[in-house]
Amino acid sequence: LKKNLLLSFFLCLALGPAMAQTNDFKVIGYLPYYRFAYNSQIEYERLTHVNLAFANPDMSGQLSLDGQDPTPVIEAAHQAGAEVFISLAGGALTPAWEAAWEHLMLPENRSAFIHQIMVYVAENSFDGVDFDLEWSHVNEKYSPFVLELRDSMDAHGLPLTAALPGTYRYPDISEEALAAFDWVNMMAYDLTGSWDPNNPGPHSPYSFALNSMFYWQGQGVPKPQLTLGVPFYGYNFGTSPVSSARYATIVGWDPANAWADQVDQVYYNGIPTIVDKTELALSQLGGIMIWELGQDDFSDLSLLRAIDETVNGVTQAEDELPLAARAYPNPLGAALIVENPGPEVLLGRLFDSSGRPLAAAIIQPGTDYQYPTLNLPAGLYVLNLQSGGVQRSIKLVKP
């Protein structure tokens, strides 16, 4: 048979089969105030929670989403059945916001500020509060503030959550403060980025998701109280300085990019990796979290749609998938053979566990392709076949 170049393989690590969706599995999407223009395009019905980001105070404690009106977003999300939280602080405080937080978290100012937070929540019909003070701003004032805010949230019957780094606990977060959160959104992304231009590579690999999960479980947070953060963006290490790229922009270059995690020096999470992480969260955790909704592609290539369909067990009809293709042997031996007896061209790529592409291919109808696998390291691989806008992933094992 005629040999061709092969198309696509994706690394797809999972701890086990996904559980059926439970009523308390959360799909949380952050929406920054500077993305409110996408309000009409976001499918809020695919979310359980929307976190509006970020509200910050002035020196008097008055909160604002940088002057943006959240009402249309709150109404749209509520109409779709999603709860809406206000997320406080964020990772990019202006000097004015930083000064206000330092001032308002002082013991003598704390109670009055928390009262203003509760008024802001009530006035805007928020369903909870997410606290996202980060890095150098997490100091000795953090835990006492969280505990007092927790008391006020309890008095109103509202949940309190936090966004925390994937594998780092700030030293000033006490055991009591950590236990005060209803759940923790693990930011399992930004392993590298624009601040580290000499370290190009995946910023949110599957291995980082696993490490984040194990880390926070080791910190005593129960699995149901952890959500796995996934990125809807990537980093382009081919520019100087290193720039970020929306997922929508990446698939706008070429729709086939939706099935990859790397294009040239741009690293991101495509549909197969997002699906794998969603399956991991379903089987091990309490939910999945998205940063952020405004960077999605609002089409059939939507990452939010891929998450929702994975959570709800939606698959495409069998006759829509390129099921005529065969890949064997599995476990892998000396070579992987992919046969395409069907009428459509198949496309794909081969990646190793670090996201490095191993091969790319087009398999013409009625042909096969053989890829040598004898020297591949032991591990899990995924053959992803794409045809006519649909794709099928086949997990492969190299013993």
Identify the residue ranges that each predicted region occupies.
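Conserved, mostly hydrophobic/aromatic
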Residues: 50, 86, 131, 184, ...
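Low-complexity, Pro/Thr/Ser/Gly/Ala-rich linker/spacer regions in secreted
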Residues: 21-23, 308-324
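Short, well-ordered coil/turn segments that N-cap beta-strands
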Residues: 25, 48, 80-84, 125-127, ...
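C-terminal outer-membrane/trafficking sorting elements
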Residues: 320-328, 332-399
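Bacterial Sec-dependent N-terminal signal peptides
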Residues: 1-22
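Substrate-binding surface in catalytic domains of secreted glycosidases
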Residues: 28, 59-69, 115, 135-257, ...
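Extracellular low-complexity, Gly/Ser/Thr-rich intrinsically disordered linkers
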Residues: 254-310
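Glycan-recognition patch characteristic of GH18 chitinases/ENGases
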Residues: 21-121, 200-207, 214
